[in-house]
Structure formats: structure tokens, C-alpha cells
Amino acid sequence: STDKHRALNYLSVRYPAIYVKAAEELERNFLLTSVNAIFSRLSDNRKIVSVIQSFTNKETGAVEKYFVRVDLTEEFPFIVTKMAPYYDR
């Protein structure tokens, strides 16, 4: 969807923490294996997208996930929550 792509584009240009996290995880032997964008359950009257980065350990196969929420309601997107661990429900 266009909103999900807007969130990904915004983060790739305006949020260096996604690159910092990828570098930190690489030092721990984790590879970036996926990036997903999903509509947040927190969006009542706002368009909020959660962008989730998944990292997989090269030796053990263990997966760690981190996410950041982006509000896309207005013309200019902005961060709702900073990068934090993500847990599947």
C-alpha cells in the first residue's frame, strides 16, 4: 500500500537509527532478514504504521525484531515511538 511505502521511505531518509541498529546487530552476528510495514492497532483517527526489522543470527537461527511507529496522517510523516524491541503476539 502507498501508506506503508511512505513510512518505509520516510525512515530510510530521515531516521538513522534503523542503520545504527542494523550495524549493531551485524556486530552480534545477526543479519537483517526482513523489513515489514503493518498498520498499527494504535491508530484510531490517525494513520500509524509500524515498521518492523527482523534480524536472524547466522549461527543459531534465533530471530530478534525491532520496530518504530510512523504517523502518516498529515502531509509530513513523523515518528510516534522510537526504535524498540518487537514481540509477536
Which ranges hold each PLM region?
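Amphipathic alpha-helical interface segments used for dimerization/assembly
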Residues: 10-11, 35-40, 48-53
